[in-house]
């Protein structure tokens, strides 16, 4: 693995992320040719950045999102501990080309789901959930034209991982079965009031969580106890600028806010 093309690609992408810089594309010798090669590059990021994986994100959990970045389905990526902040935090948009806030249902896992041959069922995944949270994800890509980078490079790019605002925890109860009907009301300081629902995330945030657990399982990785999964945008991505603030009400799951600088 030492000085392999995959490691060189991970180094180039991760260092661009740390520096707030962007690339046109990975050079051909380093460019992944498949989703599997992209995942292999992604798996090397943690060692390059020297940080723990606090949780996992899912990009493109709606048909509109998949069309926007020209991918066939969702893409998973890690969220690193250094970029997780609490409710009410201010997030810098310096170097961020996407400049959107995404209001998402988040699950914290209380029991590790290890790799195994057979897929995890919905009931098994739900039994591993310890907490739910409201969340605001602030993605970005290392690629200047992320819309045309392709799913292999976007997987290598950790599915546009960047900043995560994580709200207070609430214990799961029977209402977790009704998340498709959950209304999420956002408010932006400029007067916009976009609204969405849990059904916008693969039909159900729990379905997205199950997809992520089995995506990791299939690639030989565990969804570890203590990690969170942010499941995708319930509300269409909200364009934000420095000086603005976004608040989101997730009903029984709670409220969250983030300011931007």
Regions found by a protein language model. Name each.
Residues 234-238, 252-255:
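Short, charged beta-turn/beta-strand-edge "cap" motif at the junction between a beta-strand
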Residues 2-203, 241, 245, 255-261:
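Catalytic-core "active-site belt" of small-molecule-metabolizing enzymes
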Residues 248:
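Carbohydrate-binding surfaces in secreted/extracellular proteins
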Residues 188-189, 231, 251:
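Short strand-turn-strand beta-turns centered on an Asx-Gly dipeptide
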Residues 205-237:
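A conserved acidic, glycine/proline-rich C-terminal tail/linker
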